[in-house]
Design a protein with these regions (language model features):
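Interdomain signal-transducing alpha-helices
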Residues: 86, 90, 129-132
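Amphipathic alpha-helical coiled-coil/heptad-repeat segments
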Residues: 98, 115-149
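Sequence-specific dsDNA recognition surfaces
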Residues: 12-41, 61
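Short coil/turn segments at secondary-structure boundaries
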Residues: 1-4, 23, 101-103, 148
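Short amphipathic beta-strand starts and helix->beta connectors
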Residues: 58-59, 101-105
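A short glycine-rich beta-alpha junction/loop motif
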Residues: 65-73, 81-84, 104-123
Length: 149
């Protein structure tokens, strides 16, 4: 929809870990529901169904008020868990193995909040999480260069 009250992020609007804000459509939503679905910095969105089930996105910034589509799951975490650390976990084999084991295999594979809540996530102290994130961010450009060869 080209006009409406508020932008609604869909999984198809997320490419290369960025929201393509120009493609995000507007939607109409009642005032009482906006706060429930409003995106905030450090939220993590998960695709709950289809070919992208399990794909995740860390919301680093929300340049304008936006909500998330119903086929996404939004999660928020305590201050004892780095959202960047959790995002890297969601790119790990351990995450994908657990997700596949908890995904309902139908014509359209899907998972739900319970699948995510039941996952075992290694959670070191916050300072260690930050060191892990810094190290991964340091070596990622090198890994990307090597995989392009």
């Amino acid at each position: 929809k080209e006009n409406g009250r508020i932008k609604m992020v869909r999984i198809s609007d997320i490419q290369d870990n960025k929201v393509l804000w120009d493609t995000v459509p507007f939607c109409d939503i009642d005032e009482e529901s906006i706060e429930t679905y409003l995106l905030k910095q450090n939220d993590i969105l998960f695709a709950r169904t289809g070919g992208t089930v399990g794909k995740s996105y860390l919301v680093k910034e929300v340049p304008k008020d936006a909500i998330y589509a119903g086929y996404l799951i939004r999660t928020r975490y305590s201050n004892n868990l780095s959202s960047e650390y959790l995002k890297f976990f969601m790119e790990s084999d351990l995450y994908w193995i657990q997700l596949r084991n908890g995904t309902v295999a139908t014509a359209q594979p899907n998972c739900n909040g319970k699948t995510l809540a039941n996952m075992l996530v290694p959670i070191p102290p916050l300072a260690e999480q930050k060191r892990i994130v810094a190290k991964i961010e340091e070596i990622m450009p090198m890994i990307e260069r090597l995989t392009q060869r």
